C-alpha cells in the first residue's frame, strides 16, 4: 500500500513538473513572439519615412532618403486612379460628361467620401474633382468598377500601368489607397508617376491645382496646403492612413524649372508640409535661374528719348516682396479617416 502511495506521489510530481515545464516553455515562446513582433513593428515604423526630390527638367536627383523603400501610399494611390481616367479620356473611352453608376459597395467605403447614393450616377468630371480635392474613397471605387468592371481587376490594370511607366516597386490592390498590406509603393515611384502625368496628360495635370470643389451644394477643400501658400506650387496630392503616416507629392515650378518632391510617413500634416517646404527651399537654391533683363542706365538711353512716366521713374526702387509661407494649422481629420 505504502509503495503504491509513493508511486502515485512520484507520478503526481512528475506530471506537475511536466506541466510547469510546458507552461514555462509557452511563456518563453510568448515572450519571444512579443519581442519579435516588437522588432518588426519598430522596423516598420522606422521604414515609414522616405523622401525624394528631383528636378523634372534635368532629372537631377537633389535628395534621396529611403526613396526605394516600399511604404503604404495611402491616397497617393488616387494619383494613379486619376491617371487611368485621363487615359480613358485621351483615348475617348469616356468623356467628361459620361456618367458612372454608383454601386452599394462603393457607398460602403469609409471616409473620406462624398456620401454617394447607391443606384445614382456621377459624371467623370465630378469624379475627377472629387478625387483631387476631397480624396473621396467612394468615388475611387466607382471609377474602378466602371473602368475596370471590378475594383480588383482595376487594381491589376493600375499595377500594369505602373510597371509600364517605370514604377518598378509599386503594387496596387485597390483604387483608393485604403489599408491593404499588399498595396505598396516608394517615394521614387510616386515622383515618377507625378512626372508621367504632366508629360502624358499636361492639360489634365493642371487640374491638380484646384483648391476647392462644390458638389450638391457642399464645398470640398483640397487637402494640399501648399497650394496658394508656397510660391509656384501647382499640385499634386496628399495621402494618409494610420499605417502610412502623412504623405505628400508636390510639384513646384519657378524660373522655368520644375521640382517634384515626395514625402512619406509624416507625423502630422503640418510637420509634413513644413518638411516638404524645407526640402524644396534647400534644393531650389541649386536650380539655375533664367537670366534677368538688365535695365539700362540713364546714360545709356537715347538723348531724344521721351520723358519717363511715373511707372518708369519708380522702376529702380521696385522690389518684389518675399513670399510669406502660411500653412493652415487645421489638421483635424474629423470624418476623414483615410485621406
What do the PLM-derived regions correspond to, one by one?
Residues 23, 35-39, 45, 58, ...:
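Short secondary-structure boundary micro-motifs
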Residues 167-171, 179-184, 188-339:
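Domain-terminus/edge residues, biased toward the C-terminal soluble/receptor-binding domains
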Amino acid at each position: 500500500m505504502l509503495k503504491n502511495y509513493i508511486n502515485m506521489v512520484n507520478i503526481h510530481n512528475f506530471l506537475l513538473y511536466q506541466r510547469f515545464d510546458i507552461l514555462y516553455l509557452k511563456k518563453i515562446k510568448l515572450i519571444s513572439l512579443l519581442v519579435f513582433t516588437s522588432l518588426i513593428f519598430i522596423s516598420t515604423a522606422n521604414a515609414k519615412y522616405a523622401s525624394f526630390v528631383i528636378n523634372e527638367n534635368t532629372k537631377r536627383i537633389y535628395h534621396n532618403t529611403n526613396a526605394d523603400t516600399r511604404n503604404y501610399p495611402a491616397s497617393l494611390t488616387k494619383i494613379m486612379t486619376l491617371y487611368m481616367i485621363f487615359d480613358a479620356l485621351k483615348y475617348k473611352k469616356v468623356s467628361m460628361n459620361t456618367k458612372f453608376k454608383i454601386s452599394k459597395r462603393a457607398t460602403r467605403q469609409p471616409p473620406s467620401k462624398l456620401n454617394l447614393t447607391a443606384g445614382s450616377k456621377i459624371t467623370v468630371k465630378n469624379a475627377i474633382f472629387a478625387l483631387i480635392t476631397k480624396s473621396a474613397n467612394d468615388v475611387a471605387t466607382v471609377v474602378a468598377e466602371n473602368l475596370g468592371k471590378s475594383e480588383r481587376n482595376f487594381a491589376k490594370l493600375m499595377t500594369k500601368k505602373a510597371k509600364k511607366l517605370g514604377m518598378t516597386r509599386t503594387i496596387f490592390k485597390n483604387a483608393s489607397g485604403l489599408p491593404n498590406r499588399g498595396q505598396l509603393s516608394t517615394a521614387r515611384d510616386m515622383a515618377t508617376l507625378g512626372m508621367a502625368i504632366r508629360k502624358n496628360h499636361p492639360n489634365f495635370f493642371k487640374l491638380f491645382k484646384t483648391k476647392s470643389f462644390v458638389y450638391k451644394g457642399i464645398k470640398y477643400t483640397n487637402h494640399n496646403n501648399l497650394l496658394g501658400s508656397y510660391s509656384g506650387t501647382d499640385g499634386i496630392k496628399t495621402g494618409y492612413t494610420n499605417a502610412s503616416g502623412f504623405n505628400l507629392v508636390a510639384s513646384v515650378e519657378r524660373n522655368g524649372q520644375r521640382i517634384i518632391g515626395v514625402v512619406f510617413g509624416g507625423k502630422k500634416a503640418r510637420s509634413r508640409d513644413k518638411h516638404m517646404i524645407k526640402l524644396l527651399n534647400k534644393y531650389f537654391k541649386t536650380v539655375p535661374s533664367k537670366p534677368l533683363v538688365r535695365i539700362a542706365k540713364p546714360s545709356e538711353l537715347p538723348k531724344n528719348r521721351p520723358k519717363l512716366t511715373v511707372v518708369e521713374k519708380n522702376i529702380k526702387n521696385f522690389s518684389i516682396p518675399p513670399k510669406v509661407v502660411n500653412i493652415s494649422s487645421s489638421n483635424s481629420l474629423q470624418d476623414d479617416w483615410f485621406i
